[in-house]
Amino acid sequence: GWKLHKDSEAASAAAGDDDTVAVAPVGPQFNADSAYAFTAAQCSFGPRTMNSTAHDNCEKWIISKFKSYGLEVKTQKADLKGIDGEVFHSTNIIASYNPKAATRILVSAHWDSRPWADNDPDSTKHNEPVMAANDGASGVAVMLELARVLSADKKLSKDIGVDFVCFDAEDSGKDGDDDSWALGAQYFAAHQPEGLSWNYGILLDMVGGQGAQFYREGMSMQYASSIVRKVWRAARQAGYGSFFPNDDG
């Protein structure tokens, strides 16, 4: 989860968190088929493992898609050291909708693939790279579809901006070594782009699984409970409560 700024937390709490507050749908409808196509497009490059040709080609594609929807795109490049001393040429992609708005929301996901399928039930595949359709591509696909629908609706308020951040070098870590994971996100947190701050953020991770259900995550409830409740309530009111059970997980 992402920790809220205190002002945002207080304002959210003042607005109330119960289900009696209506949440009106805004903007054009999210298209699941479009998001699926964006997932498939990323996978068509092959596993997007660090320093690979597939990784480089997918980076260019993601940037071009965000730009095609009129978003302002910047990259944050860094050479980051992996667990075995390998240097990862990492690129965080930052795509801004309505970049001049002072009130901003951060939406993020990682876009790289894990180089080893070490959790595959078939042990013969443990040294093969992961295609990462769900764990990586699905989150980026949701962000691309959100960028598409936001850019398509000219009636939306210009007072709110959204920054979509695709984190790199996420998934080459080792179990038991927390610092070896999320290298791109760690770099982003330590080198926050100048002039950007957010009222709150949402991290999308493994959101494309068949029959997926999303429970309220513990760290998010600890640091941003009012926002979590608003998101889950909005899902229920929009008819998607079966995907967002009203329970912690």
Task: Label each region the model flagged.
Residues 4-27:
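Ser/Thr/Pro/Gly-rich low-complexity linker/stalk segments immediately outside membranes or between
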Residues 48-50, 79-82, 100-101, 111-115, ...:
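Solvent-exposed loop/turn segments at secondary-structure junctions
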Residues 18-23, 36-48, 126, 211-214:
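Acidic/histidine-rich, surface-exposed loop or edge segments in extracytoplasmic proteins
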Residues 39, 43-50, 66-70, 97, ...:
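Sec/Tat-exported extracytoplasmic proteins
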Residues 34-41, 57, 61-68, 73, ...:
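Extracytoplasmic/secreted proteins, especially bacterial periplasmic and envelope-associated proteins
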Residues 127-226:
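Acidic/histidine-rich catalytic neighborhood of metal-dependent amide-processing enzymes
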Residues 77, 87, 200, 207-249:
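Active-site-adjacent substrate-binding region
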Residues 37-100:
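A non-catalytic alpha/beta surface segment that caps or lines the substrate-entry region
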